[in-house]
Amino acid sequence: MPTSNVPLDAAFWIWGCVLAVFLGFAIYPILTLGPYIRAGCRINIHRNRIPPDNKVRQPNPNGDAFVLFLSGVGRVSALTMSRREQGILHRLAELCSDAVLLDDVFAYSINNLPLVSHRRLSPMWRWALRQKLKKRLHNSALGYLINLRNILHILISADSRYAMVYNRGCAHVITDHLQQYGYDLAQPKPLVIVSYSGAGQIAAGAVQHLSDEYRLPVYVLMLACFFTASGIDRASHVWEFIGTTDQAYRFCLLFSPSRWLIPRLSLWRRLTAAGRTTRIDMGAMKHTGRGGYLDRNSVTPEGVPFIDATAQAMADVINRIRIDTESPKEA
């Protein structure tokens, strides 16, 4: 009687999938950075043509500060499709009316090119986006291919082997974008980068080049962000907004030893000791979804919707930066 090969076949496919994933992770940074390096680290930056909505993306060279919002890992292009993110952007625009608020930088692309604009892969990403927007569990799970792809870019930004090249490209995208809205690199105004979730690593990586190469005064607001401390020391100040029930943030912090406060010589500990980091307790807020920072329905003990409390906490910091940077000029 012939023996069954089912266990052997299953093991073959399992190990084959593991090997394919490993090889994919190994060569993806090369595929991502290869064209950029071949072009001499100068590549055509994709410029989005997203019209202003009367609150966000309003060119104003007379603005006293520029605020750049970098979205979480679920985005496929510079235009956010999240109602929660749109909600906090509009609230920040109202609370910081004298600042120029921008949101149309795709943080997970070295040349700002949206996933849906790739000539060969755009059909796949459009399909993944459609699946993600569906409410069925198995469809939305397939849509998380977008998140996985963007997480790979976060890992590239954090990897010391590729970080210098990748983060420098992201800084070029940011400065090119700022100039479209009237930012003068010769007379730089305060640049406030507001990052959500995984975009914190992109911001931390770009800060080093924005400060060293372009001499910009950069302030970073991290909303439940995952990032390594490398490069963030070039920021003038870093604020972290963390909820007490955000377990995703605490889990990811385990994989960032440079931000642990226990090692005496850790960069994050030195920044904290120097008074250049501030942690703001957001109360019982989760990372995302119901009960998250951007939830409209959950409320604080004072009855304030979570999204309004988050926007107000960030606006207080942004307005303080604007006042503090204007005071020396008036004196």
Q: Where are the regions a protein language model picked out?
A:
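Intrinsically disordered, low-complexity regulatory segments
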Residues: 1-65
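Active-site catalytic motif of lipid deacylating hydrolases and related acyltransferases
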Residues: 17-20, 27, 33-47, 68-187, ...
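Short coil/turn segments at beta-strand junctions that form active-site/ligand-binding loops
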Residues: 63-65, 99, 187-190, 216, ...
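Gly/Ala-rich beta-loop-alpha elbow adjacent to hydrolase catalytic centers
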Residues: 194-199, 203
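Short, surface-exposed basic-aromatic patches at helix termini and helix-loop junctions that form
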Residues: 208-216, 232-241
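Active-site nucleophile loop of the alpha/beta-hydrolase fold
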Residues: 221-228, 243-247
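Lipolytic serine-hydrolase domain surface
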Residues: 234-329
